[in-house]
Amino acid sequence: MPSLDNTADEKPAIDPILLKVLDAVPFRLSIDDGIEAVRQRLRDLPRQPVHPELRVVDLAIDGPAGPIGTRIYWPPTCPDQAEAPVVLYFHGGGFVMGDLDTHDGTCRQHAVGADAIVVSVDYRLAPEHPYPAAIEDAWAATRWVAEHGRQVGADLGRIAVAGDSAGGTIAAVIAQRARDMGGPPIVFQLLWYPSTLWDQSLPSLAENADAPILDVKAIAAFSRWYAGEIDLHNPPAPMAPGRAENLADLPPAYIAVAGYDPLRDDGIRYGELLAAAGVPVEVHNAQTLVHGYVGYAGVVPAATEATNRGLVALRVVLHG
């Protein structure tokens, strides 16, 4: 497992193919021109069709503040009458952007790669809806799967959570809440470059302060919008899952981080904390990649390889 002691030693250069893609289609989570502008830039990113053959249904479910949009994907191997494992997917976007459409391709990748039903959750966004709105919506969706999942063919003995960036944070929180609430049982958590600690002393924040895609200025803005009135120097565990007093008895985890991501060491540290608590965990550092690399799978070979590695880990647990 990667260690915080050696993450910056002899780090290879950013993947050259990724650099060419970033030059051709520039994208940065800059907040200089306001929240609506960055939301629109994310929506406007060009996206290649991914597994268009999948059966997909949009469904509104009951939430704590009104209907929550979800999108359900069935893997091609899932016959109408068979039960399949189910993955609750929480999209990234710094808690302030992203929706069912921005992460449609990612969810299709997960449905095929994990051979599982995927339920994508359109949780409420900050700053209009600061913490804990996203968590409460995610938990409502988790309870919906536990209570109604069989209606869509889900095997309730094989529920996993997954998410990228802010969604990885949410997935980690939901895994903890499910343990604390006595269910539903979560069998695996796939966390793509999450933020779990809100620890400003982690070395990667300085090392990758001006990294492509996501820089520390954007992280600070997103964190403040999400936190609302909460002191970011002492966030509660349901907001920063790495600060939970008890990390034992959580589901096995795969934590993916990237060498050129300010959040790299956060994911590594959370992996160390889980391992110390006796939780089976694998942490993979894609040294030549950047935050958000799952979105470049299928375009950048190194991103494809790193993404497939996490999906294989998920698939093995769900179909072991």
From Swiss-Prot:
It holds the Pfam family Abhydrolase_3. Gene3D superfamilies: alpha/beta hydrolase (3.40.50.1820). Keywords: Hydrolase. Coiled coil: none annotated. The active site is at S165, D261, H291. Optimum pH is 8.0. Stable between pH 6.0 to 9.0. This is Esterase LipI. Inhibited by ionic detergents SDS (anions) and CTAB (cationic). Strongly inhibited by Zn(2+). It catalyses: a fatty acid ester + H2O = an aliphatic alcohol + a fatty acid + H(+); a butanoate ester + H2O = an aliphatic alcohol + butanoate + H(+); an octanoate ester + H2O = an aliphatic alcohol + octanoate + H(+); decanoate ester + H2O = decanoate + an aliphatic alcohol + H(+). Optimum temperature is 37 degrees Celsius. One of its GO terms (molecular function) is short-chain carboxylesterase activity. Belongs to the 'GDXG' lipolytic enzyme family. Its EC number is 3.1.1.-. Changing S165A: Complete loss of activity. The keyword Cell membrane does not apply. Esterase that can hydrolyze short-chain esters with the carbon chain containing 2 to 12 carbon atoms. In vitro, pNP-butyrate is the preferred substrate. InterPro entries: AB_hydrolase_3 (IPR013094), AB_hydrolase_fold (IPR029058), GDXG_lipolytic_enzyme (IPR050300), Lipase_GDXG_HIS_AS (IPR002168), Lipase_GDXG_put_SER_AS (IPR033140).
